[in-house]
Amino acid sequence: MSPSPFAPTIETIDYPFPPKPIPLSDAEKADYKARIKQLLIEKDAVLVAHYYTDPEIQALAEETGGCVSDSLEMARFGRDHPAKTLIVAGVKFMGETAKILSPEKTILMPTLEATCSLDLGCPIDKFSAFCDAHPDHTVVVYANTSAAVKARADWVVTSSIALEIVEHLDSEGKKIIWGPDRHLGSYIAKQTGAEMLMWQGDCIVHDEFKANALRDLKRVYPDAAILVHPESPASVVAMADAVGSTSQLIKAAQTMANERFIVATDRGIFYKMQQAAPGKTLIEAPTGGNGATCKSCAHCPWMAMNGLKAIEASLSDSDKTTHEIFVDEDLRVKALIPLTRMLDFAKTLNMKVKGNA
């Protein structure tokens, strides 16, 4: 499908990458882990971590009775868990989603500075104006968005259910505004044939995967299956043996007969993917072409901010304003409507909704 003449133009944004956490010694790591475990008990808190956080953070979440998953499942786990406080190791929109589903709970994050290029690239004022210019369109937004953008939408979707929802809306003759990920939107439009106006955002990690370099790597490992997240460019998706959400890619590595996999998504997923597929070889898909020109290099710089020191600080700091997530109640109620609409639709399909990045 050719780009709509009414779609916003693609702007090159120089995102302000955060500094990487200072490496800790083994002794410091052990001390922080012990302190965090004690504080979780004292504060009646549970730690949930996204697939893209560093392996030691995912392991700590599992060791302490928390969970490792995609952002929506993290929020649902926190909602259903008896703990009064939820520590969200991820990026800011994930904390907001948790607060939308659990307004009565305290939602803390290791740092409120951990954001997302999809969130930054879809400011509510510009996106709302875009929607207002096309009032006859149904607004569908990816879960990787702010609470304000969700509140402006008719539907919120994850990558695991986006195809089904767009097919449903298209069957009803609905014209669709899609935001913010242009690659995922283009993939869905191609699969469904739906008429969609695209917001022109992208994930800095997935946007860097390169088809030519991937083709070269495939020549080195001809027996490897290529697993691709649909936030990747169309030329990369076209080379995939399996395309899917985070949880769907983990399942593919577990169930496919191949012994090797080239994986085009954030390398943080390797922790859970290796658990699900022990003995199989996982290979990073190339970013930035054949030269050392990548910026994210297959790992989200904001996810990397969720270090042990920051998690300990979120539990021990007396000043919670640097860690606590707040969502205006009117905004929360509005954002809950399209989220609930998705969850109710999933029930009609008898499927568990997972898979936003």
From Swiss-Prot:
Its EC number is 2.5.1.72. The keyword Transmembrane does not apply. The keyword Transferase applies. Coiled coil: none annotated. It comes from the Bacteria. Iminosuccinate binds at residues 50, 71, 142-144, 159, 229-231, 246. GO terms for cellular component: cytosol. It catalyses: iminosuccinate + dihydroxyacetone phosphate = quinolinate + phosphate + 2 H2O + H(+). Its cofactor is [4Fe-4S] cluster. InterPro entries: NadA, NadA_sf, Quinolinate_synth_A_type1. Pathway: Cofactor biosynthesis; NAD(+) biosynthesis; quinolinate from iminoaspartate: step 1/1. [4Fe-4S] cluster binds at residues 116, 203, 300. It is found in: Cytoplasm. Keywords: 4Fe-4S, Cytoplasm, Iron, Iron-sulfur, Metal-binding, Pyridine nucleotide biosynthesis, Transferase. Binds 1 [4Fe-4S] cluster per subunit. GO terms for molecular function: 4 iron, 4 sulfur cluster binding; metal ion binding; quinolinate synthetase A activity. Belongs to the quinolinate synthase family. Type 1 subfamily. Catalyzes the condensation of iminoaspartate with dihydroxyacetone phosphate to form quinolinate. PANTHER family: QUINOLINATE SYNTHASE, CHLOROPLASTIC (PTHR30573:SF0), QUINOLINATE SYNTHETASE A (PTHR30573). This is Quinolinate synthase.
